[in-house]
Amino acid sequence: MKPRTTEAPRKPVHRNTKRTGELSEAAFLLKAETLGFHLAKPWGDSDRYDFILDTGPRLWRVQLKCTQVLRARGYDVQAIYSIYGKGKVGYTADDIDLLVAHIVPINVWYLLPIEAITPSKSLRLYPDIVTKNPRWEKYREAWHLLEPNQESRKV
């Protein structure tokens, strides 16, 4: 019998963006259900939102965006979708209620109400550093925004 040898640590696998998105959707499903929320997934991928999140008294249209690449000490999230013939368009309250950004390498979640991000099309999140203007940090792990008695509360 051969003695065991220690293997070199595995390098992280860089998946394509579609696979990363699928894994983030699975992680969101697990996280939300663990916190007591219920989720439904629309049939197909033609809607502007990825999930319907049920808090009891309210249904939220949730668009999930994930990012895994660190650029200039931050993570970029594009709050846009494509329309044939019109190009890239920013989300509005007619499209979604909540944009959820998943920072994959550190498993951090930002729950951003659409009113907070409109009309921005690009967000830069800095979960690892303190910034002078922490514009989005108040939405980091802000699961409390989904609680029934908190829906109208401003952050």
Question: Model regions: which residues?
Answer:
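Mixed-charge (Asp/Glu-Lys/Arg
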Residues: 1-47, 52-155
